[in-house]
Amino acid sequence: MSAGEVERLVELSGGTGGDEEEEWLYGGPWDVHVHSDLAKDLDENEVERPEEENASANPPSGIEEEAAENGVAKPKVTETEDDSDSDSDDDEDDVHVTIGDIKTGAPQYGSYGTAPVNLNIKAGGRVYGNTGTKVKGVDLDAPGSINGVPLLEVDLDSFEDKPWRKPGADLSDYFNYGFNEDTWKAYCEKQKRIRMGLEVIPVTSTTNKITVQQGRTGNSEKEAALPSTKAEFTSPPSLFKTGLPPSRRLPGAIDVIGQTITISRVEGRRRANENSNIQVLSDRSATEVDNNFSKPPPFFPPGAPPTHLPPPPFLPPPPTVSTAPPLIPPPGFPPPPGAPPPSLIPTIESGHSSGYDSRSARAFPYGNVAFPHLTSSAPSWPSLVDTTKQWDYYARREKDRDRDRERDRDRERERDRDRERERTRERERERDHSPTPSVFNSDEERYRYREYAERGYERHRASREKEERHRERRHREKEETRHKSSRSNSRRRHESEEGDSHRRHKHKKSKRSKEGKEAGSEPVPEQESTEAAPAE
């Protein structure tokens, strides 16, 4: 089908507009829908490029583009009185139809080099933020929408087909940031409540700043001048963002949806000679500090002490290493020997120690408000730590240990004395039974002395055994006499005394006879020697 046939169709539809049959058949002006297949049949030799450019640059008023529901623009040809009356071929050649599918948001180029048409069709819905400046192309900051409905107002239950519930489906293809169906519903509900004003947002969150300072500060003057903070993310309450793509996200930025918190970071310099300590500082105005500490703030549970508030002023400050009272023994270790230090024992007159309690307590700085200590109700350090009982206990324990040591020493001394006595007795016995060394004149006399010593030892042992036997016998007889019943006590006593005296006399007599025999046997060799001398 050539371009001339198309022009004839347009001419016939315009020239016979008054015919009743054609009006009844075609309904008067009718739309000419030309498909993309006709563009391939156009003869390039019949139509010249300059005419196409003029036609595309100055389109007639009868051609209009209207956007359908699917976003495809359709060319609509309407007849006018001027076109219907003109019969010249030049006027017909000026009409040119551009055929093709136009997609939303992308530049379209005609088949014959016509000017591109860029249609940015946006569905109507709630507009967030400022709408004064219109952005060409796709607005990446605009909230998403599904079929013209804002993303947060879409009801997931309205979908008949839920592909994320199918087996093997990946939830990350349908929900971002780790959401699933249930958490997404809860998130949308919370955002809806925040927009309606039902969700309570803390008022102090607009002025809270969280600053993290790395490195230790040098002195108190430098601590007062904090480095300037860099605000990396600020979410105004009138603007609602669902989050930027990773390519356009600022480094270190945090997206907080529905919150109005300013999060900043302090970049501190690390000194070479100091340790790397991390210090978290909270900036808060002095007017926001509640000076009434009788009750905790309303956002703390009852019974839990607030963590960000300073300690109550009625407690004494904890002792530091430099100001603590000296010589307090740590738990589990005995104190140093000697009397306790006088600073630990409170006197009766004062009731306070002179060293620790006289110093002025430093006030607790918190923001711009300082909390002084109540010195009148603060008890003294010695009254808190009563060490007199501890010292008494330690002194008593030391005395007990000394007594035990003295007893052990006395026992050792008694044992040594007993040993010395035994040794002296043995020496005296040996001296009594042994002759003087001046008697030793010959080997024979030495031999004789040795025999005498041995005999004397045997004699001493035999006499000792006899004494033990007599003692046992007497003991047995005494036991027997006690159990006898036919004699009187006087007679028994008399007989026992007589028996004892008789035994003693007998024992002495036997002892004397033995000694006489030994003495008589010793001078026998001397008599023999004297008898042998005259015989010679």
From Swiss-Prot:
<keyword id="KW-0597">Phosphoprotein</keyword>
<feature type="modified residue" description="Phosphoserine">
    <location>
        <position position="88"/>
    </location>
</feature>
<feature type="modified residue" description="Phosphoserine">
    <location>
        <position position="438"/>
    </location>
</feature>
<keyword id="KW-0539">Nucleus</keyword>
<feature type="region of interest" description="Sufficient for interaction with CPSF4">
    <location>
        <begin position="136"/>
        <end position="219"/>
    </location>
</feature>
<feature type="compositionally biased region" description="Basic and acidic residues">
    <location>
        <begin position="1"/>
        <end position="10"/>
    </location>
</feature>
<feature type="modified residue" description="Phosphoserine">
    <location>
        <position position="496"/>
    </location>
</feature>
<dbReference type="GO" id="GO:0005847">
    <property type="term" value="C:mRNA cleavage and polyadenylation specificity factor complex"/>
</dbReference>
<dbReference type="InterPro" id="IPR007854">
    <property type="entry name" value="Fip1_dom"/>
</dbReference>
<feature type="compositionally biased region" description="Basic residues">
    <location>
        <begin position="484"/>
        <end position="493"/>
    </location>
</feature>
<feature type="modified residue" description="Phosphotyrosine">
    <location>
        <position position="366"/>
    </location>
</feature>
<feature type="region of interest" description="Necessary for stimulating PAPOLA activity">
    <location>
        <begin position="1"/>
        <end position="296"/>
    </location>
</feature>
<feature type="region of interest" description="Sufficient for interaction with PAPOLA">
    <location>
        <begin position="1"/>
        <end position="110"/>
    </location>
</feature>
<feature type="compositionally biased region" description="Basic and acidic residues">
    <location>
        <begin position="32"/>
        <end position="42"/>
    </location>
</feature>
<feature type="region of interest" description="Disordered">
    <location>
        <begin position="1"/>
        <end position="95"/>
    </location>
</feature>
<protein>
    <recommendedName>
        <fullName>Pre-mRNA 3'-end-processing factor FIP1</fullName>
    </recommendedName>
</protein>
<keyword id="KW-0694">RNA-binding</keyword>
<feature type="modified residue" description="Phosphoserine">
    <location>
        <position position="86"/>
    </location>
</feature>
<comment type="subunit">
    <text>Component of the cleavage and polyadenylation specificity factor (CPSF) complex, composed of CPSF1, CPSF2, CPSF3, CPSF4 and FIP1L1. Found in a complex with CPSF1, FIP1L1 and PAPOLA. Interacts with CPSF1, CPSF4, CSTF2 and CSTF3. Interacts with AHCYL1 (when phosphorylated); the interaction is direct and associates AHCYL1 with the CPSF complex and RNA. Interacts with PAPOLA; the interaction seems to be increased by the interaction with AHCYL1. Interacts with NUDT21/CPSF5; this interaction occurs in a RNA sequence-specific manner.</text>
</comment>
<feature type="compositionally biased region" description="Acidic residues">
    <location>
        <begin position="43"/>
        <end position="54"/>
    </location>
</feature>
<feature type="compositionally biased region" description="Basic and acidic residues">
    <location>
        <begin position="443"/>
        <end position="470"/>
    </location>
</feature>
<feature type="modified residue" description="Phosphothreonine">
    <location>
        <position position="436"/>
    </location>
</feature>
<feature type="region of interest" description="Arg/Asp/Glu-rich domain">
    <location>
        <begin position="397"/>
        <end position="432"/>
    </location>
</feature>
<feature type="modified residue" description="Phosphoserine">
    <location>
        <position position="434"/>
    </location>
</feature>
<dbReference type="InterPro" id="IPR051187">
    <property type="entry name" value="Pre-mRNA_3'-end_processing_reg"/>
</dbReference>
<feature type="region of interest" description="Disordered">
    <location>
        <begin position="300"/>
        <end position="536"/>
    </location>
</feature>
<feature type="region of interest" description="Disordered">
    <location>
        <begin position="212"/>
        <end position="246"/>
    </location>
</feature>
<comment type="function">
    <text>Component of the cleavage and polyadenylation specificity factor (CPSF) complex that plays a key role in pre-mRNA 3'-end formation, recognizing the AAUAAA signal sequence and interacting with poly(A) polymerase and other factors to bring about cleavage and poly(A) addition. FIP1L1 contributes to poly(A) site recognition and stimulates poly(A) addition. Binds to U-rich RNA sequence elements surrounding the poly(A) site. May act to tether poly(A) polymerase to the CPSF complex.</text>
</comment>
<feature type="modified residue" description="Phosphoserine">
    <location>
        <position position="84"/>
    </location>
</feature>
<feature type="compositionally biased region" description="Pro residues">
    <location>
        <begin position="300"/>
        <end position="344"/>
    </location>
</feature>
<feature type="compositionally biased region" description="Polar residues">
    <location>
        <begin position="374"/>
        <end position="390"/>
    </location>
</feature>
<keyword id="KW-0507">mRNA processing</keyword>
<dbReference type="GO" id="GO:0003723">
    <property type="term" value="F:RNA binding"/>
</dbReference>
<feature type="modified residue" description="Phosphoserine">
    <location>
        <position position="442"/>
    </location>
</feature>
<dbReference type="GO" id="GO:0006397">
    <property type="term" value="P:mRNA processing"/>
</dbReference>
<dbReference type="Pfam" id="PF05182">
    <property type="entry name" value="Fip1"/>
</dbReference>
<feature type="compositionally biased region" description="Basic residues">
    <location>
        <begin position="502"/>
        <end position="512"/>
    </location>
</feature>
<comment type="similarity">
    <text>Belongs to the FIP1 family.</text>
</comment>
<feature type="compositionally biased region" description="Acidic residues">
    <location>
        <begin position="80"/>
        <end position="94"/>
    </location>
</feature>
<feature type="compositionally biased region" description="Basic and acidic residues">
    <location>
        <begin position="394"/>
        <end position="434"/>
    </location>
</feature>
<feature type="region of interest" description="Sufficient for interaction with CPSF1 and CSTF3">
    <location>
        <begin position="383"/>
        <end position="536"/>
    </location>
</feature>
<dbReference type="GO" id="GO:0005634">
    <property type="term" value="C:nucleus"/>
</dbReference>
